[in-house]
A protein has these predicted regions:
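NAD(P)+-binding Rossmann beta1-loop-alpha1 motif at the extreme N-terminus of oxidoreductases
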Residues: 1-46
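Short beta->alpha connector loops
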Residues: 80-84, 148-150, 172-173
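N-terminal glycine-rich dinucleotide-binding loop that anchors FAD/FMN and/or NAD(P) in oxidoreductases
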Residues: 45-57
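Short beta-strand and adjoining strand-loop segment in the mid-core
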Residues: 115-124, 129, 157-174
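Conserved catalytic-site region of short-chain dehydrogenase/reductase
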Residues: 110, 149-153
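Rossmann-like NAD(P)-binding element
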Residues: 54-102, 107-113
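Rossmann-fold dehydrogenase core element
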Residues: 121-147
Length: 174
């Protein structure tokens, strides 16, 4: 299975790639193809230097966002909340009809101490709802998930993920 990660060069993208490459072909996406290719090469080196090297059957490679969206069986949107409209607008017409779109997007902001959650406000739409609305011509399965997974733990393949996470199916025309 080809798992594409738009925003794949960020921390969450790295974590998903490192953990899922054991059994899948992972395609990191970036607006800058070279950045995605460099990140994928670094991730493969990290895997090969880990205790899991002999268990990895998949690969990680990089490409531009549009190519990743076009060839993925599952597409993870690992992007900031404020980029949902622009990113989905670019990819809406090229995603395969059988592709499953996954949104781990959580509204976050950053200050000198790091990232912090922006509380849900009345009238503000959830990330999953915005993804669905911004893929209007798509009859895709859209899943909102992985919101409670720590980026730091996800990137550390030696760490056990011991958190519960909820999944919400947001879909049209099934």
């Amino acid at each position: 299975m080809k798992v594409g990660i738009i925003g794949g060069t960020g921390g969450m993208g790295e974590g998903f790639a490192l953990r899922w490459c054991a059994n899948h072909e992972i395609i990191l996406g970036s607006r800058d193809k070279q950045k995605a290719q460099t990140a994928s090469e670094n991730h493969m080196k990290n895997i090969k230097n880990s205790k899991y090297a002999d268990k990895v059957k998949g690969i990680i490679r990089g490409n531009d966002n549009l190519s990743v969206a076009k060839e993925s069986d599952v597409l993870i949107l690992s992007i900031p909340y404020e980029n949902i409209q622009s990113t989905c607008g670019e990819i809406a017409n090229i995603i395969d009809d059988n592709c499953i779109v996954v949104s781990p997007i959580v509204p976050m902001s950053r200050n000198q101490d790091g990232f912090y959650y922006i509380p849900f406000q009345e009238g503000k739409k959830s990330a999953g709802t915005l993804v669905a609305e911004n893929l209007p011509k798509c009859n895709k399965i859209i899943v909102s998930a992985f919101h409670t997974i720590s980026e730091i733990k996800l990137k550390n393949i030696e760490a056990t993920l011991d958190a519960d996470t909820l999944f919400a199916l947001i879909t049209k025309n099934l």
